[in-house]
Structure formats: C-alpha cells, structure tokens
C-alpha cells in the first residue's frame, strides 16, 4: 500500500464520521481531527478565520446550525503525502437541515491540508466553497 493509499484509508473514514456528526449538531469529532497548535486556518464557505481558538468556536457555531444529516459523501479528486504534510482535494456532497428547515442538498469544493503531529494526522487548513449556485444559496441561509 502506498503512503497516499494508507493516508486515505486512515483519514477518509474519520473525515466522513466527523462531517456527518457536525451536520447532526456535534462538532466534537471535527475538533478532534484538527491541530490545536497554530498556525491553523479555515477558509470556509461561510466563515474564514485563523487560530485554533476561533476555529474551534466556529465549529461549535456550525454544529449548532445543522441537524438531520441524511447523507454525506466525499469524492476524492487528488491526494498526496510528503513527509509530515498531506492534502486531499475533493468534493463533499451533503444533505442536512439548517435550523428547522427540511434537509437540503449542497456540494462544496474542498481542499484540506494535514500535518503529522506526534504520529497522528491533524488538519491545519481547510478551504471550502460552494460548487454551484444552489449550494451557494444553502451557504447564505447558514449565515442568516
């Protein structure tokens, strides 16, 4: 198994679990995936911020807005590993409720960068933006 295959085999199930939980109102699995050692950055579809303290608070806020995740899938477009750094470029397909609304589909283009810390891969950067106009509408509702 190549380094990239081993990395993806380890991280994709954890990303799936963390993002499904976040979209069901629980940020704890996503918090556990992230490095708590600066520098860390988040360029989200709704919020952009830097520093673990602000990012952790952003995850709690996001979790408070989402519920009823009925589907989450991660489509990997590219991935790589070099020493203690790795990345995944992909498309996230999510169906979840925002507030009291019925579940809605949205799609994000996502780039995630990881750093190995004490033998564990931790997220240090995530950039996500809406894939299409309908996904942009969902992102706007999230920030309302």
Please give the residue ranges for each predicted region.
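Extended, polar beta-sheet/loop recognition surfaces of beta-rich domains
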Residues: 141-144
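Short beta-strand edge/turn micro-motifs at domain boundaries
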Residues: 107-137
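Residue-level signal for tight coil/turn positions that link beta-strands
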Residues: 76, 83-85, 118
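Generic short beta-strand segments
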Residues: 90-97
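A solvent-exposed, acidic/Ser-Thr-rich amphipathic alpha-helical stretch
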Residues: 8, 12-13, 27-81, 91, ...
């Amino acid at each position: 198994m190549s380094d990239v295959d081993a990395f993806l085999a380890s991280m994709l199930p954890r990303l799936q679990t963390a993002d499904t939980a976040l979209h069901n109102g629980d940020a704890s699995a996503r918090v556990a995936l992230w490095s708590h050692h600066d520098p860390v950055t988040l360029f989200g579809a709704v919020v952009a911020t830097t520093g673990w303290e602000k990012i952790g608070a952003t995850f709690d806020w996001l979790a408070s807005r989402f519920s009823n995740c009925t589907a989450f899938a991660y489509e990997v477009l590219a991935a790589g590993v070099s020493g203690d750094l790795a990345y995944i470029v992909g498309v996230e397909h999510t169906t979840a409720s925002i507030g009291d609304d019925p579940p809605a589909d949205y799609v994000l283009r996502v780039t995630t960068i990881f750093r190995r810390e004490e033998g564990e891969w931790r997220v240090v950067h995530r950039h996500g933006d809406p894939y299409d106009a309908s996904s942009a509408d969902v992102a706007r509702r999230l920030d309302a």
